[in-house]
From Swiss-Prot:
Keywords: Chaperone, Cytoplasm, Ribosome biogenesis, rRNA processing. GO terms for molecular function: ribosome binding. This is Ribosome maturation factor RimM. Disulfide bonds: none annotated. It is found in: Cytoplasm. InterPro entries: PRC_barrel-like_sf (IPR011033), PRC_RimM (IPR056792), RimM (IPR011961), RimM_N (IPR002676), RimM_N_sf (IPR036976), Transl_B-barrel_sf (IPR009000). Binds ribosomal protein uS19. The gene is rimM. GO terms for cellular component: cytoplasm; ribosome. It comes from Neisseria meningitidis serogroup C (strain 053442). The PRC barrel domain binds ribosomal protein uS19. Residues 97-169 form the PRC barrel domain. GO terms for biological process: ribosomal small subunit biogenesis; rRNA processing.
Length: 169
């Protein structure tokens, strides 16, 4: 697996703050400040990758702001606007049995108990009660609650989820 394939997109740089190189971050994580747990970030845009080290970070009015080593003025910070933030997968904490990162589920093929392909997981959404798989396929978009009542197996090796879900639901 290449380094690029082993990184997970965790958000993007949406703007700058102040004149000392601080950046505003749109995080694709449950808690935006969880990105501060990772000292090394890869910034990707238009096929270009820049590796940066987190110098400082804070949440201000529910917005994540960060500063990278060597980025000390507004102009240099602005040059990073729009870059996607990627974190190496091996930096993630290990999961418990039957626990998964959303990034690991996206792209998996979902089949039902009759082995009918329902589609691929395109995204997940949080509903408060439980997470819901958003599946795109030839049958349109299907939403399946990610709970044991409907999810029979998750095979990360074959990238397949088996669900107790009919096409007529």
């Amino acid at each position: 697996m290449t380094d690029t394939q082993n990184r997970v997109a965790m958000g993007y740089i949406k703007g700058v703050f102040g004149i000392k190189g601080w950046l505003k971050i749109a995080a694709n994580t449950e808690y935006s400040d969880s990105l501060l747990d990772y000292p090394e970030w890869h910034l990707v845009k238009d096929g270009k990758t820049i590796s940066v080290t987190l110098e400082a970070g804070k949440v201000v009015n529910s917005e994540l702001q960060v500063k990278f080593e060597g980025i000390n003025d507004r102009d240099l910070a602005f040059s990073l606007h729009g870059y996607t933030i990627e974190i190496p997968r091996e930096a993630f904490a290990p999961t418990e049995e039957d626990e998964y990162y959303w990034a690991d589920l996206v792209g998996m093929t979902v089949v039902n108990k009759d082995h009918t392909v329902l589609g691929k997981v395109s995204n997940l959404m949080e509903t408060g009660a439980n997470d819901v798989l958003m599946i795109d396929g030839e049958h349109g978009q299907i939403l399946i609650p990610f709970v044991s009542q409907y999810i029979e197996t998750v095979d990360t090796g074959s990238k397949t989820i088996t669900a107790d879900w009919g096409l007529d639901y």
